[in-house]
Structures are given as structure tokens and as C-alpha cells.
């Protein structure tokens, strides 16, 4: 598949896409022995691409782990045939090929992990993985006893589900802020739970997953995980 050179270089882990554009401007990239220009494309399957004379194929793959604070309005896919904004666009400059670990629906926001570490992805999304996911959910509707009703659910719209841990953090005149901890990754699970309990979700934000917490990472921004955070994810212990 033919792609822009800066995208190929970034995915190979050499540098960010913007830095790759600078390499092209400086004449440090070649394709099949010929100096490449910014705007050129190539096919990794057919062409020999080199940076500073060293073939990309000869470089070991770089494994990165990225935490994104996904904004509302972005779908959790690598590309979208409907032309919608994707979360992958926001981490395109991370310097390596990555995939989202699990999903957040378009109108949800918060912590979303990206990596190309297949073993870790499988661990975190496997139904038997017992991975806790913590959400802050603003709701309105039948507020009295809402936390208790949600905690008591054992099926969601006819589908068996594990018990969630729910507590009320704040109550306003017309809405309430709940903390919801679930242990599964079923499609739109919390929204379906709330609907079943007579609640409308106004905002849904994932603030923690497994050993990771969102912290003060700004909406739309991403950061690399630290070595300690990666180790904790793999071992299942707090960093």
C-alpha cells in the first residue's frame, strides 16, 4: 500500500510525523537509492526506504505505550469510512504504530490506551482479565436510589453482567455525579445500565483503567507511559 513517506517513517518509530517532514526537507530520506522529497509516497512492501542511509527495515520496531484523554466527538477507530474524527488522529505523532486498547464510544471521553503490544492488549481486553475501569458519570432522571439500583443490576437489557460498584459523589437539583466501576467491556455498557434504571447520561468520562489513572492530562492531549507504568500494567500492580 502506497503511503506518504512521513507517515511511514513515523510509524516505524524513527520520529514524529512533523520531524519526518523535516528529514525530507533536509534530503535525508531516500527511496530505492534516490533522494526523496516532501510529498513523495512509497510502499514498504516494494520500496527500499532509508533515513540517513539506514534502511527502515533494518531498524528494530519501537514499542510505545500512549495514554490519550479522548475528547467527545471522536470515534475509537484507526480510520472511519464516514469521515468522522478518530482518536487515532490525536496520537498520530507518537512515533510508532499503535492500536487502541478497547473502546470509548463517540460521546464518551477520558482515558484511552494505545499500544502495539499484542500480549498486553489481549490481557486488558480479555473478558477474564478482571480489569477494573472507573468512570465519572453525570446523570439526570430518577436520582433517588440511583447508585443502589445500578449496583444491583445483574443483567443489562437481557444480557447477564457482573455487578458494578457505584457510589454517588455529588447531588445537584437536577443531576448527580456518580462513580461507576465495571469489570467488563461490553458495548455501551454504562449507558445501557443507566437507561435501564431511568437515568439519562449527560457526561461519561473514564478516569482510570487497571493500574492507570488519567490524572491532570488535558482533553485531547496524550503522553507516553513511564517504564514503571508499563511494568505495573503487565504485572497488574499499581505503579
Where do the model's predicted regions map?
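Basic, flexible Lys/Arg- and Gly-enriched helix-loop patches that mediate nucleic-acid binding at interfaces
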Residues: 2-239
Amino acid at each position: 500500500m502506497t503511503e506518504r513517506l512521513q507517515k511511514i517513517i513515523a510509524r516505524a518509530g524513527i520520529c514524529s510525523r512533523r520531524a519526518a517532514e523535516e528529514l525530507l526537507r533536509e534530503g535525508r530520506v531516500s527511496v530505492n537509492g534516490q533522494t526523496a522529497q516532501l510529498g513523495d509516497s512509497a510502499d514498504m512492501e516494494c520500496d527500499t526506504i532509508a533515513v540517513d542511509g539506514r534502511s527502515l527495515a533494518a531498524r528494530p520496531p519501537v514499542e510505545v505505550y500512549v495514554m490519550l484523554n479522548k475528547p467527545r466527538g471522536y470515534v475509537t477507530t484507526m480510520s472511519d469510512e464516514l469521515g468522522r474524527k478518530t482518536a487515532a488522529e490525536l496520537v498520530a505523532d507518537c512515533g510508532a504504530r499503535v492500536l487502541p486498547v478497547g473502546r470509548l464510544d463517540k460521546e464518551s471521553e477520558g482515558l484511552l490506551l494505545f499500544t502495539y503490544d499484542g500480549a498486553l492488549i489481549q490481557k486488558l481486553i480479555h473478558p477474564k482479565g478482571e480489569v477494573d475501569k472507573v468512570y465519572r458519570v453525570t446523570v439526570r432522571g430518577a436520582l433517588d436510589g440511583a447508585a443502589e439500583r445500578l449496583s444491583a443490576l445483574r443483567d443489562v437489557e437481557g444480557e447477564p453482567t457482573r455487578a458494578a460498584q457505584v457510589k454517588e459523589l455529588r447531588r445537584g437539583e437536577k443531576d448527580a455525579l456518580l462513580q461507576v466501576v465495571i469489570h467488563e467491556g461490553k458495548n455501551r455498557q454504562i449507558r445501557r445500565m443507566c437507561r435501564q434504571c431511568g437515568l439519562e447520561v449527560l457526561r461519561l468520562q473514564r478516569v482510570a483503567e487497571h493500574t492507570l489513572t488519567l490524572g491532570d492530562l488535558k482533553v485531547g492531549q496524550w503522553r507516553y507511559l513511564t517504564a514503571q507504568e508499563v511494568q505495573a500494567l503487565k504485572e497488574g500492580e499499581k505503579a
